[in-house]
Amino acid sequence: MRLLNSVCKVIASSFTGVPVHIEEVPDDFERGCFYVFLTTGSTELKNFVTYQDNPIFQIVYFGERNEADQVIAENLYEVKETLKRLFVLSMVMPVLPAEGVTEKSRYAKIESYSDEMRISEGAIYARLALNFTEDIPSAQEEYELMGDVD
């Protein structure tokens, strides 16, 4: 969920005022919005304390239509170029900090990005593959003090 929220934050910060839906699109959604969800993912254990997540996210942008219910293609091209700039040219994506943990800034490597524009649907379908290495959370060991040092 941390990486999904991070992808949504990157999109929301560049498309101010455009809704970003996670997991499902509401029945009464209005066009001019994003829908982001995890399509596939794998996790690989690197060693005893580190693992690597390799999620693939689907980003769908539903473009606005005019009064005649026709797609405004120019807006689709602008969104397509902005998404490409966000997820290709930067090569890394900032990751939100884990809940309740103070840590330095973390980044996920962008492995690949592809998109398909469907003018007939008035939508852009993009796939984003990430690579993120994370420490395995360890349980705090409970112990008693042997005594006070004088």
Residue ranges with predicted function:
Residues 1-21, 42-150:
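Charged, amphipathic alpha-helical segments and their flanking helix caps
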Residues 21-31:
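Short acidic low-complexity segments
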Residues 30-40:
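A short, hydrophobic beta-strand-centered structural micro-motif
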